[in-house]
C-alpha cells in the first residue's frame, strides 16, 4: 500500500514517539513576528536558554505596523512589541526583516518569495494562517506562544498526527472565479469544522492549472475549515517558483529530485474524500460572522436556521432573502496574507483601470511585502490604483485585523480580501465581507457588490 503526502512529510520528521502516541517532529523553518513571540523569548531568558537554530528562524514585522506613516507608531503596546522583537532578535541572533527592510512584509508572503518556504519542510509560526506554506508541499501549521518557545529552544515540537482529507477539484474555473471563491464555496457547503483533526490535501485538474499564488490562497484558508493544515503536492510550477530565490537551495537539481517524491501514491485511500467540480462555481460573498456564512453573488441571503444566524444577521445589519447586490460597501481592503501578492494586485488593477472609486467609499491596497510593492510599482499598478481613488500603502497585515491603525468604523461594511469575518475582526462593530480581489475592486467602484463576471476587464488568470 502506498503513502499519502501527509504520511511522507510526517515520517521524514519524526525524531521520537512517546507512550501517549505523540510524535516529536523536527522543525525545518520557524517564522516569527512581533505579536506571539515576546513571552517565548522571555521564557528563554528565564531558563537561561538560547535559540537552538537561529539559522532556521526568520522574523519580520507585520501585524502591528502602520501602513501609512510606518515610523509613526502611536500605540504604546504596538511600539513595545516591535521594539521587543528587535531586542530579542539582536540578543538571540535571529535574522529580522525590520520596517523599511527590502525583505519585510507579511510573514506568509515573504516566506515563499524569499525561498525560505520549500517542498518537504516542516514550517511553524505563531500565526493561524501558517497553512499558506502548504501550497509548496510543506507541512505548515500555526502554533501558540508556549510552542513558539519550545521550538526556539529545541527546534522540535510534540504533535499528534492528524488524519488525511483529500479534496479533489475537477474541471476548469470560469472567468471571474478564483481560488478565493473555491475555498469560500467549500466552507459554505461543509462548514468551519469539517477539517477538525485533519490535514486537507488539495489536488486535481483545477489545482494543476493554478499558479502558486492561487494555491497559497487555498491553503491559507484551510484553517477556516478547522484543518490543522492545507497541503498541495509540489510540481514543476512549484519547483520553478522556488528556483533562484535568495534562500533557495544552492544544489537545486539534486534537491529537486527529492522534492519530486512528494506526492500521494495512486493506491491510497484518504480518511475523508471530498469532490468538487469547479466548472459552474460563481464568485462568493460572505454575509455573516464566520467564513462559512457565504453565498454565490447570484443568490439571495439565506433564511435563519438557528441562533447563530439570528445573531449574525443582527450584527451585520442584513436580512434573510436580501439580494447580495443590495449590501452597501463603505470600505474596501485589498491585502492580507490571503490575497496581497502581485497577481492579486494585477487582477484588482485590471478591474479599476480607467475608472473611479464610488464617492463615499474608502479603498485601500496594501501589498503583502516590500518586494510585492516594488514589483507592482515597476508595472505601474500604483498609478492605476491612485488614479482610481485607492490609497496605496506600505506592506503589513493592515485592515485584516483590528490591531493597527487600519480599521473599519463601527456599523460600516468592508469588502475584504482577507480570511476572517468574525465580529470585531476589522475593528469594533466592523462588518466584514470576504471576497476575491476582483470582487473587492468592483465593489469599490459601485459602493455595493456586483457580479464581476458581468464586468468588462482583462484580469482573468489563464488556466490553460
Curated annotation (Swiss-Prot):
Binding site for [4Fe-4S] cluster: 337, 397, 400
UniProt-listed GO biological process terms: L-leucine biosynthetic process
Cofactor note: Binds 1 [4Fe-4S] cluster per subunit.
GO MF: 3-isopropylmalate dehydratase activity; 4 iron, 4 sulfur cluster binding; metal ion binding
Top-level enzyme category: lyase
Disulphide linkage map: none
Pathway assigned in UniProt: Amino-acid biosynthesis; L-leucine biosynthesis; L-leucine from 3-methyl-2-oxobutanoate: step 2/4
PANTHER family membership: 3-ISOPROPYLMALATE DEHYDRATASE, HOMOACONITASE, MITOCHONDRIAL-RELATED
Function, as annotated: Catalyzes the isomerization between 2-isopropylmalate and 3-isopropylmalate, via the formation of 2-isopropylmaleate.
Name of this chain's protein: 3-isopropylmalate dehydratase large subunit
